[in-house]
UniProtKB/Swiss-Prot annotation:
Disulfide bonds: none annotated. This is Protocadherin alpha-11. Residues 30-133, 157-242, 243-349, 350-454, 455-564, 580-677 form the Cadherin domain. The keyword Cell membrane applies. SMART domains: CA. Residues 1-29 form the signal peptide. Residues 780-789, 908-922 have a biased composition (Basic and acidic residues). Coiled coil: none annotated. Residues 753-807, 826-949 are annotated as: Disordered. The lineage of its organism: Eukaryota, Metazoa, Chordata, Craniata, Vertebrata.
Length: 949
């Protein structure tokens, strides 16, 4: 204090330093915590704020923080609860190594006023380090002469932990030669050694593999291992040994010099120089040292002179083997050599007059070559016999002594074997006999006896329609088993007529590569299947050929937009005018948009969407997603606009989808005005009374005609059904073609187009479908029908169906037919018979119930084609007394409903084309008939409304 005054410091500054020093002493208290190493993130260490006497609310305000010089990120404080916790991995061995004490020093600093606290966190050791040896394998070299109880030091393991976790104990794997000596001083091993319990024998056990395991004292225990490889060093304590003590060898008298007589082999179980063996001749009896030699390194005994059977028949050779140890050790054996009298001249073979190559169509007994043999020996040793390679189509025929002919024994096939390597063997009669061989190569010349062959008799190809001209659609390949020009294959079309056009106008085939090209764009709507043949011809003489059938299926693409069908109140694509009474309730069907799509499958599956009104205003109408029926969403009231312009977007399910737009003009009128206005709209400039008379006349005519047809059809069908026997198969020629069907739900007529299937049998054919609806029991007189268009076909004459006739998806799902085809001979005959499906797609399907929608038959399947399906049983057929819900007037867009519905039902009223008249309930119609004066007023109002539209 006085020192500061001597330096000239003023009293105020001195007081400030004293104040700071006082705060420092107050806040410099020290806390102690402990935490185990490797603790997880978030592990609780201590309530540091509580232990320091700090309030939790003031930690943030006073800028509470923790600082450390070296390891500040290991621990962290939660300012919300004042708890010190582990922030990151703590490794004691990394922090403090082998030190007995390990701690982390933290400084806790708070401001306002400034205070510094010292926190000491002790890191406790856990047993997380196993014992580790410095080497994976320790090698020990021990001589086999070492005495028992000999000691061999080992290098111990180390443990990075401390105290009990680093206290190691050792154990040795079980063995009969060594034990482990591990004396301790109470804390750690002083010296680790192996003790030899039993003398080693290198010849029995050249090396030992032991496993030394070190275990620490932690909880749980951790271990470490090292492999001990003990190699036993050799001592020269074994003699060289031969395989046998005596050897017997037979040797020809004409054996040449350096001929190997015998190779001796002596082994010494010692190793190194103690196991190296040298050989030496001790004696040869009778006197024959000049006849044989012995290689001292490899033990080979060889002929060194000329042997003579008549001079000596046996030789006895004594051999010694000596190792290079100190002192050297030796082994002995005896070799007996027998001299044999042999046939020393081999036969000779000569092949002449070869007739090669041989054609594969050569006849048996054809002479291929002449063979002669000879032998310079005499007697039995000079008698020679010949033989040929077995299992070949050739044989040797002896013509006279020592002459043979090589002839063909059986037919040749070059495709199986194109060449033969024959071996002619000549053997004499000596003992042992000598032989000689001669090789004859016989090549088989090819003959064109194999036609080109395709991998399979028929190929199926799928091509998308609208392909570019010259498009490569397939490649045919035929293989000819012959060779050279006989295997050279060229391709061509099997030309024929497809209707009025040649096949070559559709496709072409490259003569060399076999690639098939489409010469023009294919149209799925015109041609679904193109069947033709491709011929493969070789270049042989005479040429051979074969055909393969190609079935080219033209896949549909979405290239046709939906087409709107003409209605009674407007043309296709034009606006349709509809009058709706304001008194109708929710769900009342206002109109129905009909459309067809010339594509197939999903490309022809249509959906309907009502476009939002201009200005975003909400309209009280909706359209069925798959039926096209426009109905009210709620009851109409006076607040609704008297006129609505509805835009219905018709969209198919192709990729990309194509659309069409229909316009429906809806006028809201009073309840009594709708029927009269509809009548005048239908009649146009004609008088209302004349229009109503025409409608009634046409309706009565249509009902009478259809009723007559239904009665006739039902009688004919019943007679055929009961007259048919259960064993009938296909219809005999001359029986009428009959298609009986039953519809479930509403069904309408759609556009029927002619589908051409081009096959190789005759000209293209067009499927003919005939529908014979059942006769209704009675027709409700008050049910409003539809008139039949003038000019309808005569009942006996076929007519192209009206474009407004098409089967709905729900109808197809529930429709089953019994089909009799005269030409194809297909007849339903009990279980297993053909089951006809009607894969057509219609825009006139009714609104599905409970959100169910009848899907299309499937993408790529034409909606107007016939598909015969052979199933395990027959579907239920409609009986003579069962009636369909509706029937169709052929050649007319009229669809007559004979369902018995409630009087107030408005369901499916839009399925009828009423020539501009909206159908009301029967109760409303009766009320309208009773009030003629009100009807005249409605006519005037309807005229005014139509003029406004």
């Amino acid at each position: 204090m006085f020192g500061f005054q001597r330096r000239g410091l003023g009293t105020p500054r001195l007081q400030l330093w004293l104040l700071l020093l006082e705060f420092w002493e107050v806040g410099s208290g020290q806390l102690h915590y402990s935490v185990s190493e490797e603790a997880k993130h978030g592990t609780f260490v201590g309530r540091i704020a509580q232990d320091l006497g700090l309030e939790l609310a003031e930690l943030v305000q006073r800028l509470f923080r923790v600082a450390s010089k070296t390891h500040g990120d290991l621990l962290e404080v939660n300012l919300q609860n004042g708890i010190l916790f582990v922030n990151s991995r703590i490794d004691r061995e990394e922090l403090c190594g082998q030190s007995a004490e390990c701690s982390i020093h933290l400084e806790v600093i708070v401001d306002r006023p400034l205070q510094v606290f010292h926190v000491n966190v002790e890191v406790k050791d856990i047993n997380d380090n196993p014992p580790v040896f410095s080497l994976r394998e320790q090698k020990l070299l021990i001589a086999e002469s070492k005495q028992s109880d000999s000691r061999f030091p080992l290098e111990g393991a180390s443990d990075a932990d401390i105290e009990e976790n680093a206290l190691l104990t050792y154990r040795l794997s079980k063995n009969e030669y060594f034990s482990l000596d591990s004396p301790t001083n109470g804390k750690q091993i002083k010296r680790l050694s192996l003790i030899l319990k039993k003398s080693l024998d290198r010849e029995k056990t050249p090396e030992l593999n032991l496993l030394l395991t070190a275990t620490d004292g932690g909880k749980p225990e951790l271990t470490g291992t090292v492999r001990l490889l003990v190699q036993v060093l050799d001592v020269n304590d074994n003699d060289p040994e031969f395989d046998k003590s005596e050897y017997k060898v037979s040797l020809m008298e004409n054996a040449a010099k350096e001929t190997l007589v015998l190779k001796l082999n002596a082994t010494d179980r010692d190793e190194g120089v103690n196991g190296e063996v040298t050989y030496s001749l001790m004696s040869i009896k009778p006197n024959g040292r000049h006849l044989f030699t012995l290689d001292q390194n490899n033990g080979e005994v060889r002929v060194n002179g000329t042997l003579d059977y008549e001079e000596n028949k046996f030789y006895k050779i004594e051999v010694q083997a000596t190792d290079k140890g100190t002192p050297p050790m030796a082994g002995h054996c005896t070799v007996w050599v027998e001299i044999l009298d042999t046939n020393d001249n081999s036969p000779e073979v000569a092949v002449t007059s070869l007739s090669l190559p041989v054609r594969e169509d050569a006849q048996p007994s054809t002479v291929i070559a002449l063979i002669s043999v000879s032998d310079r020996d005499s007697g039995v040793n000079g008698q020679v016999t010949c033989s040929l390679t077995p299992h070949v189509p050739f044989k040797l025929v002896s013509t006279f002594k020592n002459y043979y002919s090589l002839v063909l024994d059986s037919a040749l096939d070059r495709e199986n074997v194109w060449a033969y390597e024959l071996v002619v063997t000549a053997r004499d009669g000596g003992s042992p006999s000598l032989w000689a061989t001669a090789r004859v190569s016989v090549e088989v010349a090819d003959v064109n006896d194999n036609a080109p062959a395709f991998a399979q008799p028929e190929y199926t190809v799928f091509v998308k329609e609208n392909n570019p001209p010259g498009c490569h659609i397939f490649t045919v390949s035929a293989r000819d088993a012959d060779a050279q020009e006989n295997a050279l294959v060229s391709y061509s079309l099997v030309e024929r007529r497809l209707g009025d056009r040649a096949l070559s106008s559709y496709v072409s085939v490259h003569a060399e590569s076999g690639k098939v090209y489409a010469l023009q764009p294919l149209d799925h709507e015109e041609l679904e299947l193109l069947q033709f043949q491709v011929s493969a011809r070789d270049a042989g003489v005479p040429p051979l050929s074969s055909n393969v059938t190609l079935q080219v299926f033209v896949l549909d693409e979405n290239d046709n937009a939906p087409a709107l069908l003409a209605t009674q109140a407007g043309s296709a694509g034009g606006a349709v005018n509809k009058l709706v009474p304001r008194s109708v309730g929710a769900g009342h069907v206002v109109a129905k948009v009909r459309a067809v799509d010339a594509d197939s499958g999903y490309n022809a599956w249509l959906s309907y969407e009502l476009q939002p009104a201009a200005g975003g205003s909400r309209i009280p109408f909706r359209v069925g997603l798959y039926t096209g029926e426009i109905s009210t969403t709620r009851a109409l009231d006076e607040a609704d606009s008297p006129r609505h312009r509805l835009l219905v977007l018709v969209k198919d399910h192709g990729e990309p989808a194509l659309t069409a737009t229909a316009t429906v003009l809806v006028s809201l009128v009073e309840s009594g005005q709708a029927p009269k206005a509809s009548s005048r709209t239908l009649a146009g400039a004609a008088s209302p009374e004349a229009a109503l008379v025409d409608v009634n006349v046409y309706l009565i005519i249509a009902i009478c005609v259809v009723s007559s047809l239904l009665v006739l059809t039902l009688l004919l069908y019943t007679a055929l059904w009961w007259s048919a026997t259960p064993t009938e198969g296909a219809c005999a020629p001359g029986k009428p073609t009959l298609v009986c069907s039953r519809a479930v739900g509403s069904w309408s007529y759609s556009q029927q187009r002619r589908q051409r299937v081009c096959s190789e049998e005759g000209p293209p054919k067009t499927d003919l479908m005939a529908f014979s609806p059942s006769l209704p029991l009675g027709l409700n007189k008050e049910e409003e029908g539809e008139r039949q268009e003038p000019g309808s076909n005569h009942p006996g004459q076929p007519r192209q169906p009206n474009p407004d006739w098409r089967y709905s998806a729900s109808l197809r799902a529930g429709m089953h037919s019994s089909v009799h085809l005269e030409e194809a001979g297909i007849l339903r005959a009990g279980p297993g018979g053909p089951d006809q499906q009607w894969p057509t797609v219609s825009s006139a399907t009714p609104e599905p119930e409970a959100g169910e929608v009848s899907p299309p038959v499937g993408a790529g399947v034409n909606s107007n084609s016939w598909t015969f399906k052979y199933g395990p049983g027959n579907p239920k057929q409609s009986g003579p007394g069962e009636l369909p819900d509706k029937f169709i007037i052929p050649g007319s867009p009229a669809i007559i409903s004979i369902r018995q519905e409630p009087t107030n039902s408005q369901i499916d009223k839009s399925d009828f084309i009423t020539f501009g008249k909206k159908e009301e309930t029967k109760k409303k119609k009766k009320k309208k008939k009773g009030n003629k004066t009100q009807e005249k007023k409605e006519k005037g109002n309807s005229t005014t409304d139509n003029s406004d539209q």
